[in-house]
């Protein structure tokens, strides 16, 4: 991935690394950057433009249905709902919005007590506006709580709207889905994550290298929250963003090591490939960490297309076995053996 350099913030490859800049967090508490730079308006949200434009229509017209926003973590689901509530309610936001995290408040008592009591409260709002109940991680709610919520949504439909954020909409019962407009968010692209990172870097005056930004984007995998947390953690710990510092903070198998291991497999050199695997294993990385990074590196590895297909098929098969609980070093070594076998010259009989 190409990363554009920006003024004095970046460092040319080959230049001497500057001495670490002491973090601004020293000596006093600083707000996490995830909260500090959380968008407050819908047009500030990065990515998922089509879905956000639908929310902007809701905000303009004021007639909001119950909504479910489903998508991966760190894509802006909860932030979008809060921006919508702010656009609709303005100064009344504090009194007219109840925000609950359903992964904590997941039982039927929450629906019967907190949600029902809030829905019954009288709040003075502009004409055509409704109170909003935000349920984050709604797919963690028990079936009993969801059944109780269905009836509550019907009874208080004249005064209250429900906004649910979840990772998987299929874990929300059908009766609730049928009462809501379902909006889907996708993972953010590398370019979208990079644009927001550069915005924060410029405001916080963070020194960085291109490979450091690539490392943050690689570890984030389309999760903006993860990217900003990794950026702040690396800056707080080292005062300088480069790939070495990022992987010290994130502590996952280094993609350069994984890339070298895949190259040995392409060269059918099982001994050297196994040495790298054993090294990663002895560092304490789990099979899930290793197999996940093997897949992510393999996707962009320069090799023949037919070979890449064969490699990914074997990686997927091994990932399935690891997920089933067969997560020994022998299982991972078997993957390397099968990958090497794909590129070995046939033995003459």
Curated annotation (Swiss-Prot):
GO terms for biological process: DNA repair; DNA-templated DNA replication; positive regulation of DNA-directed DNA polymerase activity. It holds the Pfam family AAA. CDD domains: AAA, HLD_clamp_RFC. GO terms for cellular component: Ctf18 RFC-like complex; DNA replication factor C complex; nucleus. InterPro entries: AAA+_ATPase (IPR003593), ATPase_AAA_core (IPR003959), DNA_pol3_clamp-load_cplx_C (IPR008921), DNA_Rep/Repair_Clamp_Loader (IPR050238), P-loop_NTPase (IPR027417), Rep_factorC_C (IPR013748), RFC_lid (IPR047854). It comes from the Eukaryota. Its main location: nucleus. ATP binds at residues 71-78. Residues 1-27 are annotated as: Disordered. One of its GO terms (molecular function) is ATP hydrolysis activity. It is found in: Nucleus. Keywords: Acetylation, ATP-binding, DNA replication, Nucleotide-binding, Nucleus. The modification N6-acetyllysine is found at residues 158, 299. Residues 1-26 have a biased composition (Polar residues). The modification N-acetylmethionine is found at residue 1. Subunit of the replication factor C (RFC) complex which acts during elongation of primed DNA templates by DNA polymerases delta and epsilon, and is necessary for ATP-dependent loading of proliferating cell nuclear antigen (PCNA) onto primed DNA. This subunit binds ATP. Belongs to the activator 1 small subunits family. Subunit of the RFC complex, an heteropentameric complex consisting of a large subunit RFC1 and four small subunits RFC2, RFC3, RFC4 and RFC5; the RFC complex interacts with PCNA. Forms an heterotetrameric complex with RFC3, RFC4 and RFC5; this complex has ATPase activity but is not stimulated by PCNA. The heterotetramer of subunits RFC2, RFC3, RFC4 and RFC5 interacts with RAD17. RFC2 also interacts with PRKAR1A; the complex may be involved in cell survival. Interacts with DDX11. This is Replication factor C subunit 2. It comes from Rattus norvegicus.
């Amino acid at each position: 991935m190409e990363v554009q350099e920006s003024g004095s913030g970046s460092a040319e490859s080959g230049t001497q690394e500057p001495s670490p800049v002491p973090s601004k967090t020293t000596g006093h508490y600083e707000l996490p950057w995830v909260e500090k730079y959380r968008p407050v308006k819908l047009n500030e949200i990065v990515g998922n433009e089509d879905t956000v434009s639908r929310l902007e229509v809701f905000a303009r017209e004021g007639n909001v249905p119950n909504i479910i926003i489903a998508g991966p973590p760190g894509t802006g689901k909860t932030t979008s709902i809060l921006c919508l509530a702010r656009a609709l309610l303005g100064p009344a936001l504090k009194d007219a919005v109840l925000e609950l995290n359903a992964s904590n408040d997941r039982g039927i008592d929450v629906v019967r007590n907190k949600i029902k009591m809030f829905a019954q409260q009288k709040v003075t709002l502009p004409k055509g506006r409704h109170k909003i109940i935000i349920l984050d991680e709604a797919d963690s709610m028990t079936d009993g709580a969801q059944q109780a919520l269905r009836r509550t949504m019907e009874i208080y439909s004249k005064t209250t709207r429900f906004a649910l954020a979840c990772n998987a909409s299929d874990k929300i019962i059908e009766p609730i889905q049928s009462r809501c407009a379902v909006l889907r968010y996708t993972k953010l692209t590398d370019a979208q994550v990079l644009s927001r990172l550069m915005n924060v870097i410029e405001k916080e005056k963070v020194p960085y290298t291109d490979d450091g930004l690539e490392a943050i984007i690689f570890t984030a995998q389309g999760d903006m929250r993860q990217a900003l947390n990794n950026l702040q953690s690396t800056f707080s710990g080292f005062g300088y963003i480069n790939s070495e510092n990022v992987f010290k903070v994130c502590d996952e198998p280094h993609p350069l090591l994984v890339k070298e291991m895949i190259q040995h497999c392409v060269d059918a050199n099982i001994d050297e490939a196994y040495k790298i695997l054993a090294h990663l294993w002895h560092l304490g990385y789990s099979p899930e960490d290793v197999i996940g990074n093997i897949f992510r590196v393999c996707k962009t590895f320069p090799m023949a297309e037919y070979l890449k297909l064969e490699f990914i098929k074997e990686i997927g098969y091994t990932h399935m076995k690891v997920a089933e609980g067969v997560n020994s070093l022998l299982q991972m070594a078997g993957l390397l053996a099968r990958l090497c076998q794909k590129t070995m010259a046939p033995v003459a009989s």
